[in-house]
């Protein structure tokens, strides 16, 4: 009788637990697409849209994230932090994973993310088919259904996903303009990545790109990574800019968080131009917003500073002669002119856009 009572209690507890709602990720949605390039494989797309997307007419950069079955929540969190702090723009995240019945990510990523076949993984070698899926099926799917900027795509992945990222950089140069590779599996097939880079280098037809890659400091492959980094640095590409880092006291999987944080900062990095006083002084003075907010702009030591009150200020950096920004929050300013004279600016802050007119 006691055993029956215990079973009854456990059953009730399980049923009660099963009634709780699942945690979801606000601002995200799931779409599915079946590929003809990868033999009828169904892919699940985990898509994150920026706040304000529904009422905006602008197009957004798109980050394509590999292995989103593991990393979509992480990247969603990173995006929110980096956007709020003003290091990256509003963007769309498209996480790609596998759909269908009981997909095995370990086997499928070995198939889709590797450029050649290794005997230990007979399913490997499908990277070109997967990239064909992305180029001819996934991009059109996203860009016809979402406000996606086709000229601003970023590829991001770890391990084999990082291998795919570097392989794409060297062999499918027109697909992306930003690449973030966490602990890439550069040793694949006797370091065949060097052969792809050789062909890439000899073509001398490189499109502009920014690349960020890392490795964990406790990984055994650190010497090989450092060799690759030096090799690429010695190439001295004119349009491909590469930044790398060995992450202290970090293992293989642990590279993702810092890599995706710093990688997104790097690929979206804006210039900090030095403007002459003659330019900055055009912008100094008093301004008033449509809601009555009053601010002052001052030139302090060849740096434009905006004051909302004496104790509330932002240092501004010049991305161009008329565009300025701050990095302690999402804060972008674009100055406007009337008959050659500065008459105001548009201020784009986190979830808020406002116009200001110059009053003196």
Task: List PLM regions with ranges.
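Bacterial Sec-dependent N-terminal signal peptides
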Residues: 1-21
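Short beta-strand/loop motif that positions the catalytic acidic residue
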Residues: 212-215
